[in-house]
Regions:
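A conserved helix-loop-strand patch within extracytoplasmic ligand-binding domains
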Residues: 41-94, 198
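Extracytoplasmic/secreted proteins, especially bacterial periplasmic and envelope-associated proteins
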Residues: 6, 10, 15, 25, ...
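Acidic, polar ligand-binding/catalytic clefts
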Residues: 17-52, 60-62
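Short helix-initiation/N-cap motifs at beta->coil->alpha
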Residues: 1-9, 100-130
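Beta->alpha turn/N-cap motifs
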Residues: 3-4, 14, 18-31, 123-125, ...
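Ligand-binding clefts/hinges and TM-proximal coupling segments of bilobed small-molecule sensing domains
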Residues: 75-104, 189-212
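Extracytoplasmic
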Residues: 13, 21, 39-40, 48-52, ...
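Periplasmic-binding protein-like
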Residues: 44-57, 148-192, 211-212
Length: 212
């Protein structure tokens, strides 16, 4: 699959029995968009790993170095806005509304933005590495899987990376409701949770992907 839409389309059409690419906040946004559609009655069968999202720049070495009016290029997904904004807030570049749920926060929830940074969530995720390589914008937010595919190092190349601790964005095995109890699905989740697979993930990705 070349985007984040087709895996759920295939699951809804029963072309596949499960998919493994999305986190709970993204799944919730999909379920909201397809409310009442029985083909989209999906649930998580288990969380497997986290791919910490990174912010990349060829022009600046930290978020605090970004210029006034700096353009931040982001993926076109509402479910990612709070995730990304939390990184900027943690670095002291912006502030969100007090008490807001960071998972569901939106760009409109920014209450302090001294640098007047311009967040532009309108780019398909697979195009973000190319925009970074073309030196577009002042910073580009790239999901780890696309960064890896583009030959980037998601641990050392970004100027800021989200923490893997208490991270709600773990990738999950998604199935139709009720299928999470099927023997084959339970076996799949158990294999992915096994020490052998978790050790392989740690060795292969060296921190770019974190097993849960």
């Amino acid at each position: 699959f070349q985007d984040y839409i087709l895996p759920n389309t295939a699951l809804a059409g029963h072309d596949i029995d499960a998919n493994y690419f999305q986190h709970i906040p993204y799944l919730n946004s999909v379920l909201k968009d397809h409310a009442g559609d029985k083909d989209y009655d999906f649930v998580s069968a288990g969380a497997i790993h986290i791919e910490p999202i990174g912010i990349y720049s060829k022009k600046y070495k930290s978020l605090k170095d970004l210029p006034e009016g700096g353009k931040i290029i982001m993926r076109d997904a509402v479910s990612e806005e709070g995730r990304i904004l939390s990184i900027f807030e943690k670095e002291g570049v912006i502030k969100l509304k007090p008490g807001i749920d960071k998972v569901t926060a939106r760009i409109s929830d920014i209450v302090e933005n001294p640098k007047k940074l311009k967040f532009t969530p309108n780019v398909e995720a697979s195009l973000l590495p190319q925009m970074y390589n073309n030196n577009e914008g002042d910073a580009v937010v790239i999901n780890a899987n696309y960064a890896i595919d583009a030959g980037l190092d998601p641990v050392h190349d970004p100027i800021a990376v989200e923490s893997g601790e208490n991270n709600p964005y773990a990738n999950i095995i998604t199935v139709h409701r009720g299928d999470e109890k099927k023997k084959d699905i339970v076996a799949l989740v158990n294999v992915l949770h096994s020490k052998e697979i978790q050790d392989w993930i740690r060795t292969k990705y060296k921190g770019a992907v974190i097993p849960v």
